[in-house]
Amino acid sequence: MSTNICSFKDRCVSILCCKFCKQVLSSRGMKAVLLADTEIDLFSTDIPPTNAVDFTGRCYFTKICKCKLKDIACLKCGNIVGYHVIVPCSSCLPSCNNGHFWMFHSQAVYDINRLDSTGVNILLWGNLPEIEESTDEDVLNISAEECIR
């Protein structure tokens, strides 16, 4: 997906947790909207979530666009929490987008604003280090209380 048209560096980074079981799914979440229908709010991430979600079901296409999608489910509780864009379609690819292919339904996850290294300011995408995704709570330094709030 193209990111040269729009800038997302001032967007807040979120920790995404499953609403059903409170499992941390990603430490690199961003609030987003569906390209094909901007009335639909979502969350997205740029790195495949490891040890948190897995594919479920078959690939499918929507009526709105021709992107090839596959649902993802929380590994802890099994509920579908979003989908992965396997192949973006020719109409979505050139659109203003954040380049993320991992999408989370706002009805299935909740977000917690991630703080920067000072622990005071909200971390912005422009300041986010490019590291490999991990959902290990020790690595993320997230307390259970913070994820439950």
Swiss-Prot record:
Highly homologous to GCUD2 but localized to a distinct locus. GO terms for cellular component: cytosol; intracellular membrane-bounded organelle. Belongs to the FAM72 family. Pfam families: YPEH2ZP (PF14976). InterPro entries: YPEH2ZP (IPR026768). This is Protein FAM72B. It comes from Homo sapiens (Human).
